[in-house]
Amino acid sequence: VGVLKALAELLPKGTPNPFGIISGTSAGAVNSIVLASKARRFKMAAAELERVWAAFRCHHVYRTDHLTMLKSSLHWMVAIVFGGLAGGLPRSLLDNAPLRSLLSRNVRFPRIETALEQGWLEAVAVTAAGYGSARSVAFFEAAERHSEWSRTRRIGRATRLNLDHVMASVAVPMIFPQVQIDGEYYGDGAMRQATPLSPAVHLGAERILVIGIRDETADPAPDRLHPDSYPSFGQIAGYMLDTLFMDGLYSDMERLTRVNQLLDSVPPDLDRGEFSGMRPIDTMLIVPSEDLRVVAERYRGELPFAIRALLRGVGGQPEGPSRLLSFLLFERAYTQELIRLGYRDAMRVKDQLLAFATGEPVPRLFAPEWIRRDLNSLGG
């Protein structure tokens, strides 16, 4: 959101949405839908996103009252002890009905169709993972008749987007309830999404602005003199979610960079043969200059007591940066800090960002130096 705020300030007043194609997964799906529904006025859309995220509290996203948390804990305990024979199996650890209510009040889905008809938007896609089919499904709505696509374990499906698609995309496994769409249950779009850039590419994007949520500096490895303690359930769950959300993007960017290098190596006057239907795609990547887990740790005390107790119960690292914490922390002090961080990082590259958004000539790949070095290396 901070990056979008910076771009809104850089663009002239009254500028419509600069992104013809918008694609998002998980929390990015929420931002994508808001941008698409307010595509006529980009500054207004960015301001609306900032207003909502800056005012977030955990109870706006999931129920945090003691009674609900007690019922959920007891339900899980009974299900484990009796194998689901008493009271049925729990659907999730937390209930995110408040988020559904918040989105239903703030997002007008019919405005997406209007934006498409008026030419303010070309297409918008929201990705979710199907549990029955074991596929990553990009639900998209487009101005023109875009062909649906089918690849190994991933498809693109044309539809009229609604709240269920967004709630499915944010349904973090085990934490939030899964959502049924057309007879199949769907969960967080990051699952099975090995190619997160794919929806934008299939929908015709020639430039892709990627807003990452973590830098790729490696965590320090433990040594024999200071070995790690045995990982708790919370640490393992946090690691699984961290992998789920982080790893696909950089692998996909590496593939895209290699394809670009291959296409750029062919002289324009020569036949590209089997690659004739492919096109190079400019990419700009903006990532946080600070580890969000470290930022989250500074605001651990902002969590409601019931959620802090839950984290302690599952061993979610009472001290030190926690992967699981950053997935549950939706308090305004933390989200405001994230907005400020994104804004600062975007303004550091404001000239390149503005050029990228307005169609000016840009490098094929713009990213932090250490990422650019890795992506540009063909050494594997």
What are these regions, as identified by a protein language model?
Residues P90, L103, L263-G380:
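C-terminal helical/tail subdomains of lipid-metabolizing enzymes
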